[in-house]
From Swiss-Prot:
This is Receptor-type tyrosine-protein phosphatase eta. It comes from Mus musculus (Mouse). Keywords: Cell junction, Cell membrane, Cell projection, Glycoprotein, Hydrolase, Membrane, Phosphoprotein, Protein phosphatase, Repeat, Signal, Transmembrane, Transmembrane helix. CDD domains: FN3 (cd00063), R-PTPc-J (cd14615). It comes from the Eukaryota. Residues 39-122, 170-266, 270-358, 359-443, 444-527, 528-621, 622-718, 717-803 form the Fibronectin type-III domain.
Length: 1238
């Protein structure tokens, strides 16, 4: 080194680098340390003390004058520290296992002395033995920095032999097998592959046993193992030997660090878990476990078996052995010694008995139905286990005994068993089993029963006291005639066929199992006799002669039970017993369907399986006679006859005339008191004789008919089409010409000529009471001026109703009470003619015509005729006329008053000329007293009130209903809607399309609360549904049945199953609830033109008798509340459509009761009269009969009484009406009528 390079400077502060001597300057460059001393003496004898991170240098020199020591780092800079007489230097902070070159330079002589030193690697840490076996041990340690490899020294502490293993790489798994030589020292190194292009690769070993013995194998650690650990497995060690393992860490040049050691001892060989298997009387198999884990040295096992009087020795090299030549039921002590070479390990021990010998002569000694005895022989066993198994089953129980015999009890009779016996040694060791089979004796059958018997078959069942299988039952059936039938069954039942009907058999059953037969048992049983056939019945009205046949061979001993039942209800009429094949049954009911059932019986009461039977009917009782009643003003006859005795399904009604013949079946007839039948024959001709026959029908039979000749009544003559001709004769007379009326409704009895000075309105019967005197005094502008009686003229002049008549009016003639007075000059007169088929005179009123009781029709009025001026004195004539008229009026009023008084006493209500009141308002608290007053004397007061209502509204015009095109739309020609209140439909193609027989009716809240209409006709169904749609109807109240008393009262206008179209309206029923008193139906009504629809509910009251009233008031009241509850859900402007047949009687009663309930609840008053009056001003004949009028008052009384009793909520409000009074049956009631009966 040049002097220029030797300069002194302060050393840098570098962590980890310390100087032991402050005057010394240390310079590091790639492991070099330069240290300079003073010249002239050179440096010699350099020594070093090395550790993993430091080097202590010491040296000698002879330069006592050295003033400094310099250490140079030629790569960086030179550092110089003044030193004086220093001969050592401690260098720290070095890296373990690293080679360094140190140079010491003398400053004086510039001479250099170099020294290369490698620091020690760190010693291993965490050295421990992870597992130790008999010949193996596994050691692991943690790697140290700077370690390139490890060397292991293993010493056997007993023999002091050792093995040196080098080349162990950090982080690897190694395996080393100890050599078998007796060398005290051996060295081994890791084997490696030839380096490839990527460097040296260790041998990957997966099966260490495949490597050559004594080789050291190193493999890469498995994935997941800590790479900082190194492991070595030492194999082929000596058992039960102590070893010392010392680990040296080595630098790359072989420099070793401080050693670390671990002393361990291998386990000795040991036998454990010695077991004996497959133990028999003379042998057994032994198994055990060994802890030997080596592979180089073979281990052997020496077995010593000692017991009884001899022992057995055996040597094997595996952990099992078969020991033979042993004695039965002997206790043996077994020892298993392990030997590894000459070294004996820890032995294993076992003490075990051999099995006893198999028993001999195992046999069945005795047998019964419930037990089997067993016996056997054995020489070396004192305990035995017996297993008992039923054939086909599993071992279900076992028994133990110390004897050499055993009785097995509680067995099943007739059952095969399998017995197995096993001897047991003193410790319970089992010997070989022995088996024997045995069967119990079968038991006799019990409870033999005949479960089914027919004419030729017998089904038998019996019981057995056990459930044993394999039974065979032998059956023998023997009859009295000696015939024998044999058969077998494997079940406890059998069906035996080919038997003889009605025969007694002796049945015997023998049980058998495994060809062992048990005790027999027997019963006797008859087969059933055959049913009778060819049943013939001859009947009268009350008897039946019955005969039959039975073709069985044993039929001579048969008896017969004859049962007569009513067909339908099955009630027993009579039961008879006979031994003959015929019988006469008396005291039957005529016209009744009977069932005769004949059971054949034999011996002990065994009967035929099914009876022979036949249906028959007694002859119906004939109708003895009947009488005819004429229906006033109807082309009909009412027929009445005594109800025949017995039952009948109807009657065949024959009606014959000269040109007409009709047979009608009456399903039934109306009976007032169950003693008299009645029916109405309609659609006949007036005033015609008919040959009528009535025959009783029942069960398809018809009795002899009863016959009679009946003549129909008469009615008002047909209204003539033309009007009379009137011409002026003088200033006070005219001439009236007319043709006779048609006589199809009865012979014309009289004609009345009527004059009027008023409007040409259609006259009514009311005008017949007015005379010339009434006209003259101004009481009426219409009067009867002349009367022609056909009977008289017919006798004297031979005139008939087809002739033309000419009457002089004003000739001052008198006919009965009518004066043909002179006419007024300058007057305008019109004439009409009244024709009579029946004319009645009021003898108490000057012989005037009684229009109410006469059958009359009127021609239209003629055109007006004007009279000329009277040339005479007019004033006197006028005065005389007026005076005369007053006198006549007074007399007529007196006569009428007298008649009125008489009629009231006789309860005959007649027409009153007094103008009736419009209202009779009564307070609720006074109504009961009023009701009692009116009810007195057979409802006389109510009759007078009802009579006052008779003609209310009848004069109101009905022109639209009388148009020819509309007449066919009316069900009855006397129930026509008033023009003022009629319901008008939309006009479609014709001006009369707006007509339907219906009126708006006032309710409590509105004048159009209701629509009252007739029951639809087949030709008005479309109009009816058009009205429902156009008038926005949501509820229909129907108060009639479609057919009553055999007459159609209303067409069934609704669909029942599928939707139906009525013009543009489609109707579909969605539900129907049928109850005893009414039926509720729901519909959907849809207009096909605009596809709009709304719901509709029909309340069909079916308990209102024809021509009567409901049986109880609360029935109708609750029905009304049912309707009103529904109306709360629909639009308030929607009217309720109410109809019966004509739409006046029952319809008016329902509407009236609705208004009365509202009046009672809201006003605390009652006005039955006023409400009916109001209804009749909107539609004729509303509340049609007097009984209906009285019924309304009764309803009011019941409501008021219920309110007083605080029961209104219970009876009339919030009622689930569909469940009330469901079991009441309506009773027909008849009463007086006012107008047409609907």
């Amino acid at each position: 080194m040049k002097p220029a390079a030797r300069e002194t400077r302060t050393p840098p502060r570098s962590p980890g680098l310390r100087w032991a001597l402050l005057p010394l300057l240390l310079l590091l460059r790639q492991g070099q340390v330069l240290c300079a001393g003073a010249a002239p003496n050179p440096i010699f004898d350099i020594e070093a003390v090395v550790s993993p991170t430091s080097v202590l240098l010491t040296w000698k020199h002879n330069d006592s004058g050295a003033s400094e020591c310099r250490i140079e780092n030629k790569m960086e800079s030179n550092l110089t520290f003044p030193v004086k007489n220093q001969t050592s230097c401690n260098i720290t902070g070095l890296s373990p296992g690293t080679s360094y070159t140190f140079s010491i330079i003398s400053v004086t002589t510039n001479e250099t002395l170099n020294k290369t030193i490698t620091t020690e690697p760190w010693p291993v840490s965490d050295l421990h033995v992870t597992s130790v076996g008999v010949t193996q041990a596994r050691l692991t340690w943690s790697n140290a920095n700077g370690t390139a490899s490890y060397r292991m020294l293993i010493e056997e502490l007993t023999t002091h032999s050792s093995v040196n293993i080098s080349g162990l790489k950090p982080g690897t798994n190694n395996s080393f097998a100890f050599p078998e030589s007796n060398e005290t020292q051996a060295d081994f190194a890791v084997a490696e592959e030839v380096p490839d292009a990527n460097g040296t690769k260790r041998i990957p070993v997966t099966n260490l046993s495949q490597l050559h013995k004594n080789s050291l194998v190193s493999v890469d650690p498995p994935s997941g193992q800590d790479p900082s650990l190194t492991e070595i497995l030492l194999t082929d060690l000596k058992p039960d030997t102590q070893y010392n393992a010392t680990i040296y860490s080595q630098a790359a040049n072989g420099t070793e660090g401080q050693p670390r050691n671990k002393v361990f001892k291998t386990n000795s060989t040991q036998v454990s878990d010695v077991r004996a298997m497959n133990i028999s009387a003379s042998s057994m198999t032994l198994t055990w476990k060994s802890n030997y884990d080596g592979s180089r040295t073979s281990i052997v096992y020496k077995i010593h078996v000692a017991g009884g009087t001899h022992s057995v020795n055996q040597t094997v090299n595996k952990t099992e052995a078969i020991i033979l030549g042993l004695s039965s039921s002997t206790l043996y002590n077994i020892t298993v010694h392990p030997f590894l070479g000459q070294t004996e390990g820890t032995p294993g021990f076992l003490q075990v008995y051999t099995s006893p010998d198999q028993v001999s002569d195992f046999r069945v000694t005795n047998v019964s139905t419930r037990a089997i005895g067993l016996a056997w022989r054995s020489n070396d066993s004192k305990s035995f286990e017996i297993f008992i198994k039923q054939d086909g089953g599993e071992k279900h129980r076992n028994a133990s005994t110390g004897n050499q015999s055993y009785m097995v009890e509680d067995l099943k009779p007739g059952t095969s068993y399998h017995f197995e016996i096993i001897p047991r040694g003193p410790d319970g060791t089992e010997g070989l089993s022995s088996t024997v089979n045995g069967s119990t004796d079968p038991s006799a059958v019990t409870d033999i029963r005949v479960v089914n018997i027919s004419t030729t078959e017998m089904q038998l069942e019996w019981q057995n006291t056990d459930d044993a299988s394999g039974y065979t039952y032998h059956l023998v059936l023997e009859s009295k005639s000696g015939s024998i039938i044999r058969t077998n069954s494997s079940q406890k039942w059998i069906t035996v066929g080919s038997l003889t009907p009605g025969t007694l058999y002796n049945v015997t059953i023998f049980p058998e199992v495994d060809q062992i037969q048990g005790i027999s048992n027997s019963i006797t049983q008859y087969t059933r006799p055959s049913s009778v056939s060819h049943i013939e019945v001859n009947t009268t009205t009350t008897t039946a002669a019955i005969r039959w046949k039975n073709e069985d061979a044993a039929s001579a001993s048969y008896a017969y039970s004859v049962l007569i039942l009513k067909t339908g209800d099955g009630s027993n009429v009579t039961s008879n017993f006979t031994k003959d094949p015929s019988i006469l049954i008396p005291e039957l009911i005529p016209g009744v369907s009977y069932t005769v059932k004949i059971l054949t019986q034999v011996g002990d009461g065994t009967t035929s399986l099914v009876p022979g039977w036949n249906l028959f009917c007694t002859e119906p009782e004939p109708v003895t006679s009947f009488h005819c009643e004429v229906v006033p003003k109807e082309p009909a006859l009412v027929l009445k006859w005594a109800c025949p005795f017995g039952m009948y399904t109807g009657f065949e009604l024959g009606v014959r005339s000269d040109s007409w013949d009709n047979m009608t079946r009456l399903e039934n007839c109306t009976s007032d008191d169950d003693t008299e039948c009645r029916t109405e024959v309609a659609y006949l001709n007036f005033s015609t004789s008919y040959n009528i026959s009535i025959a009783t029908l029942s069960c398809g039979k018809m009795a002899l008919p009863a016959q009679n000749i009946c003549t129909t009544g008469i009615t008002d003559p047909p209204t003539p089409d033309g009007s009379p001709n009137i011409t002026s004769v003088s200033h006070n007379s005219v001439k009236v010409k007319f043709s006779g009326f048609e006589a199809s409704h009865g012979p014309i009895k009289a004609y009345a000529v009527i004059l009027t000075t008023g409007e040409a309105a259609q006259p009514s019967a009311d005008v017949l009471k007015y005379t010339y005197e009434d006209f003259k005094r101004g009481a009426s502008d219409t009067y009867v001026t002349y009367l022609i009686r056909i009977e008289e003229k017919g006798q004297s002049q031979g005139l008939s109703e087809v002739l033309n008549y000419e009457i002089d009016v004003g000739n001052q003639s008198t006919t009965l009470g009518y004066y043909n007075g002179r006419l007024e000059p300058l007057g305008s007169y019109r004439a009409c003619v009244a024709g009579f088929t029946n004319i009645t005179y009021n003898l108490q009123n000057d012989g005037l015509i009684n229009g109410d009781e006469s059958y009359v029709s009127f021609s239209p009025y003629s055109e007006a005729v004007f009279l000329p001026q009277d040339p005479g004195v007019i004033c006197g004539a006028v005065f005389g006329c007026i005076f005369g008229a007053l006198a006549i009026t007074a007399v007529g009023g007196f006569i009428f008053w007298r008649k009125k008084r008489t009629d009231a006493k006789n309860n005959e209500v007649s027409f009153s000329q007094i103008k009736p009141k419009k209202s009779k308002l009564i307070r609720v608290e006074n109504f009961e007293a009023y009701f009692k007053k009116q009810q007195a004397d057979s409802n006389c007061g109510f009759a007078e009130e009802y009579e006052d209502l008779k003609l209310i509204g009848i004069s109101l015009p009905k022109y639209t209903a009388e148009i020819a095109e509309n007449r066919g739309k009316n069900r009855y020609n006397n129930v026509l809607p008033y023009d003022i209140s009629r319901v008008k439909l939309s006009v479609q193609t014709h001006s009369t399309d707006d007509y339907i027989n219906a009126n708006y009716m006032p309710g409590y809240h509105s004048k159009k609360d209701f629509i009252a209409t007739q029951g639809p006709l087949p030709n008005t169904l479309k109009d009816f549904w058009r009205m429902v749609w156009e008038k926005n109807v949501y509820a229909i109240v129907m108060l009639t049945k479609c057919v009553e008393q055999g007459r159609t009262k209303c067409e069934e206008y609704w669909p029942s199953k599928q939707a139906q179209d009525y013009g543009d309206i489609t109707v579909a029923m969605t539900s129907e609830v049928v109850l005893p008193e009414w039926t509720i139906r729901d519909f959907v009504v849809k207009n096909m033109q605009n596809s709009e629809s709304h719901p509709l509910r029909q309340f069909h009251f079916t308990s209102w008798p024809d021509h009567g009233v409901p049986d109880t008031t609360d029935l109708l009241i609750n029905f009304r509340y049912l309707v009103r509850d529904y109306m709360k859900q629909i639009p308030p402007e929607s009217p309720i459509l109410v109809h019966c047949s004509a739409g006046v009687g029952r319809t008016g009663t329902f509407i009236a009761i609705d208004r009365l309930i509202y009046q009672i609840e809201n006003e605390n008053t009652v006005d039955v009269y006023g409400i009916v009056y109001d209804l009749r001003m909107h539609r004729p004949l509303m509340v049609q009969t007097e009984d209906q009028y009285v019924f309304l008052n009764q309803c009011v009384l019941d409501i008021i009484r219920a309110q007083k009793d605080s029961k209104v909520d219970l009876i009339y409000q919030n009622t689930t009406a569909m469940t009330i009074y469901e079991n009441l049956e309506p009773v027909s009631m008849f009463g007086k009528t006012n107008g047409y009966i609907a």
